[in-house]
């Protein structure tokens, strides 16, 4: 009897370990530039809130877009539990924006990684098709040290101008996924695709035969806005241009577009409370700001 009990307990523990949640995120953090700083949205200020937001969501792995090297350095300083893979799109080193994949160092072992350009020759740092900018897709092959599961994680930022570049870039990413995936390893794709759920590139991924849109297949969904906000908390749309796609082996439990913001200059104005407001509360008016001009997409799922 005791032996049977121990066997059952071991089986239950094994099942619990294999079904542990994986939280992933896609976040266009907006490149650091002087123009944003003049408008009150400088990286030095918003980066602190953005990293606090990421740490609260606690993703095991996440993809970012528009990231410059100095921003990566700041993020690693503020979130030392993470490491990253990826290179700058201009030269394959430190130049220009990255599309990095961040991962928790104590939870995941990096097995392999790489970057390819969304271009006719994906091995060269050059413009692809009708693109206005060089574009990359960075990827990592990871092993979960707790569950022993392995998976691929791809992250990209498609062109904002080139229609052909987006379509052909989507086809290239699907092709590279098929080329790299071994033994049907699960795969995750995050990114700012600069097109929404009604677009041709979106359909390329959906019709790949092995990818699902997390928004569509999630059991629970909290998405009251689109993913681009232009640094204005009042802006609203139903366009999701930041996406998370996963292979069909994943069970997606929760999907959210997180519209959290922060308050700036809260000491500038006295607020006029309503007649029913608690007298003990002294209110101030402030400026509501977003940590980026995109909202992060957060997904909770299981293998």
Regions found by a protein language model. Give the residues of each.
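Active-site neighborhood of phospho(di)ester-bond hydrolases with catalytic His/Asp-centered motifs
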Residues: 63-65, 86-87, 188-192, 212-216
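Active-site metal-binding loops of divalent metal-dependent hydrolases
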Residues: 27-29, 156-158, 192-193, 295
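N-terminal, active-site-proximal structural segment of metallo-dependent hydrolase catalytic domains
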Residues: 17-79, 89-97, 171, 289, ...
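Short, solvent-exposed loop/turn elements at domain surfaces
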Residues: 31-40, 111, 163, 222-225
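Bacterial Sec-dependent N-terminal signal peptides
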Residues: 1-21
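Metal-dependent phosphoester-hydrolase catalytic domains
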Residues: 164, 178-187, 195-303
């Amino acid at each position: 009897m005791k032996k049977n009990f121990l066997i059952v307990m071991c089986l239950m523990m094994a099942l619990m370990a294999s079904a542990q949640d994986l939280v992933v995120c896609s976040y266009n953090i907006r490149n650091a530039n002087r123009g944003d700083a003049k408008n009150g949205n400088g990286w030095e200020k918003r980066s602190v809130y953005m990293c606090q937001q990421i740490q609260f969501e606690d993703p095991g792995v996440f993809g970012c877009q528009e990231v410059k090297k100095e921003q990566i350095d700041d993020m690693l300083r503020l979130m030392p539990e993470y490491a990253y893979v990826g290179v700058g799109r201009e030269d394959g080193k430190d130049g220009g924006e990255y599309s990095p994949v961040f991962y928790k160092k104590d939870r995941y072992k990096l097995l392999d990684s790489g970057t390819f350009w969304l271009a006719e020759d994906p091995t060269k740092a050059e413009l692809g098709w009708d693109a206005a900018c060089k574009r990359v897709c960075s990827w990592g092959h990871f092993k979960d040290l707790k569950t022993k599961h392995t998976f691929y994680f791809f992250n990209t930022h498609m062109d904002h101008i080139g229609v052909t570049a987006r379509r052909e870039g989507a086809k290239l990413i699907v092709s590279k996924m098929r080329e790299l995936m071994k033994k049907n390893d699960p795969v995750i794709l995050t990114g700012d695709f600069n097109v929404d759920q009604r677009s041709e590139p979106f359909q390329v991924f959906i019709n790949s035969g092995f990818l699902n849109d997390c928004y569509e297949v999630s059991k629970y969904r909290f998405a009251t806005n689109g993913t681009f906000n232009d640094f204005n908390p009042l802006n609203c749309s139903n366009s999701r241009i930041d996406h998370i796609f996963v292979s069909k082996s994943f069970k997606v439990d929760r999907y959210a577009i997180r519209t959290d913001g922060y308050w700036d200059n809260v000491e500038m104005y006295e607020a006029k409370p309503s007649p029913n407001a608690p007298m003990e509360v002294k209110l101030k008016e402030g400026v509501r700001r977003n940590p980026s001009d995109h909202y992060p997409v957060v997904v909770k799922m299981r293998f």
